[in-house]
Amino acid sequence: MAALLGIVSPVTFTGKHPVNSRSRRRTVVKCSNERRILFNRIAPVYDNLNDLLSLGQHRIWKNMAVSWSGAKKGDYVLDLCCGSGDLAFLLSEKVGSTGKVMGLDFSSEQLAVAATRQSLKARSCYKCIEWIEGDAIDLPFDDCEFDAVTMGYGLRNVVDRLRAMKEMYRVLKPGSRVSILDFNKSNQSVTTFMQGWMIDNVVVPVATVYDLAKEYEYLKYSINGYLTGEELETLALEAGFSSACHYEISGGFMGNLVAMR
């Protein structure tokens, strides 16, 4: 359940993606810096906590998210809020050495972890990944540039979700999909209770061992402030997507939004 936080970050990248020629004014988003600090702080233990708290299930959920994206061999794809790189690595296996993966995150510490992990992997497809520090609500890419976009545990932490969805729509090619994995904000009281109980009695106590209790207490707050599956579908349609469907997975604890441009 650490993947539950949905973290992102930047480091020594394989290269900076050239900013497009369109003049785009950067806007400072309230609270984004505080969230960046939080994600930077947990970066060193993020992967270990993901495995421990989810009992390894986060790997299954991430594989599902990548499959729903429709990414295939030779594609140029984007992983937003890439964190330590799990989804980006899975995407690279889909697109192969003839494809390209961009992993973007606003946390430099998370990106540093991702770059280190990449350097230790032997498969040639992992060389097609490029890491870039950036903001999900102001993407440094051209219109209609990507064949697929993924986001794992990121939208919940974005201050302006509609703007982020509009940016994903903008950079996607027509007919392509975005796949967004995150905690599910359930309408079922039992599921909501169990989520809260797990965070209070499992996640936070384990995080306390790593001196990260306050950072992981944020998780419960962020889920409460997130959107239900139906609200996420509405958000995607409002952003311009032609269709959207939210899937509840892992007993309703997690959810995945799939939207088609």
Curated annotation (Swiss-Prot):
SUPFAM superfamilies: S-adenosyl-L-methionine-dependent methyltransferases
PROSITE patterns assigned: SAM_MT_UBIE, UBIE_1
Subcellular location(s) of the protein: Plastid, Chloroplast
Extent of the transit peptide: 1-30
Catalytic activity, EC: 2.1.1.329
Catalytic activity: demethylphylloquinol + S-adenosyl-L-methionine = phylloquinol + S-adenosyl-L-homocysteine + H(+)
Null allele phenotype: Lack of phylloquinone and reduced growth under normal light. Loss of anthocyanin accumulation under high light.
Pfam families, alphabetized: Ubie_methyltran
GO biological process: methylation; phylloquinone biosynthetic process
GO (cellular component) term, any one: chloroplast
Family affiliation: Belongs to the class I-like SAM-binding methyltransferase superfamily. MenG/UbiE family.
HAMAP family, sorted: MenG_phylloquinone_subfam, MenG_UbiE_methyltr
PANTHER family: 2-METHOXY-6-POLYPRENYL-1,4-BENZOQUINOL METHYLASE, MITOCHONDRIAL, METHYLTRANSFERASE
Protein's recorded name: 2-phytyl-1,4-beta-naphthoquinone methyltransferase, chloroplastic
Annotated source species: Arabidopsis thaliana (Mouse-ear cress)
